[in-house]
């Protein structure tokens, strides 16, 4: 199935924000009264950006600053330099900044996916005056894509090895019934765990058959992104990967942490509606 297509071949128009909120916060504050972090002109700053929202993805906007992305979900990646970065629900970004020597105020903003509403903090270098930042950007942002994911390369990738087992997980559901599921099965306490065995290299193929993006999160393990839309590569090691509508993403992990572990969409309303399963091994 081609990217951006849903079952039956119809063109997909992503449904990006199915829950509306009154405000978006950065460290518990809006841009009406943002957190101001005092920094040194010419200094270096490490931003750790955590998308702890329940249902909202963002574009991180550094304005005039070049940011160096050095880790995702706590795992180092080869540096990627940009001024905007995409962050899905539950993902984390470590971004290193080298500030100019002149005093200035630098907004670090998060623009809601598909909309213009935004939040953020202010880096204040050398006591520079701070202008009020509007809570809407000049223009709406686009839907999140996998463009950044394709560029990421793990500093410490998994050892090369053939997979012992692969599970295909079709991401299923719709906005009408608001039942979200895996392989058309909404999880209950009677749903059996995915079968795997200790020591195996396991691949999970996520196929998004819905009009919404889903950030898929695995507990107890890190995985490596190894394939997007049938193109193999050695991507980032992380624990949450976005699967946009009509896309296919493969992740690989080693079964080296026995127990009962959750695997689910991190959009909390989707998790609660049934897009959840477990894996268990001893």
Residue ranges and their predicted role:
Residues 2-146, 159-160, 229-232:
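Histidine- and aromatic-rich segments of cupredoxin/plastocyanin-like copper-binding domains
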Residues 69-83, 162-282:
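Active-site pocket scaffolds in enzymes
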Residues 137-166, 173-175:
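Compositionally biased low-complexity segments at domain edges in trafficked proteins
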Residues 29-31, 151, 187:
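A Trp-anchored, charged/polar loop motif used as the substrate-binding/catalytic surface
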Residues 51-53, 152-154, 208-210:
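A short glycine/threonine-centered beta-strand motif
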């Amino acid at each position: 199935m081609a990217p951006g297509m849903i079952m039956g071949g119809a063109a997909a128009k992503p449904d990006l924000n199915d829950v509306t909120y009154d405000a978006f916060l950065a460290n518990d504050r809006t841009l009406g009264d943002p957190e101001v972090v005092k920094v040194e002109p010419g200094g270096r700053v490490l931003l750790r950006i955590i998308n702890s929202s329940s249902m909202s993805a963002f574009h991180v906007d550094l304005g005039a600053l070049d940011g160096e992305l050095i880790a995702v979900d706590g795992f180092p990646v080869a540096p990627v330099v940009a001024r905007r970065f995409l962050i899905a629900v539950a993902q984390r970004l470590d971004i290193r900044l080298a500030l100019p020597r002149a005093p200035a105020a630098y907004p670090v903003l998060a623009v809601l996916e598909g909309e213009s509403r935004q939040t953020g903090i202010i880096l204040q270098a050398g006591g520079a005056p701070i202008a009020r930042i509007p809570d809407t950007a000049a223009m709406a942002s686009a839907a999140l894509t996998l463009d950044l994911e394709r560029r990421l390369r793990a500093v410490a990738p998994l050892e090369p090895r053939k997979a012992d087992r692969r599970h295909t997980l079709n991401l299923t559901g719709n906005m009408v019934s608001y039942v979200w599921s895996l392989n058309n099965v909404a999880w209950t306490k009677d749903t059996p765990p995915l079968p795997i065995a200790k020591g195996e290299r396991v691949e999970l193929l996520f196929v998004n058959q819905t009009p919404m993006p889903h950030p898929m999160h695995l507990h107890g393990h890190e995985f490596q992104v190894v394939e997007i839309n049938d193109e193999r590569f050695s991507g980032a090691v992380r624990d949450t990967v976005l699967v946009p509508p009509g896309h296919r993403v493969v992740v690989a992990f080693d079964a080296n942490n026995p127990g009962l572990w959750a695997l689910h969409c991190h959009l909390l309303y989707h998790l609660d509606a049934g897009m959840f399963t477990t894996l268990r091994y001893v």
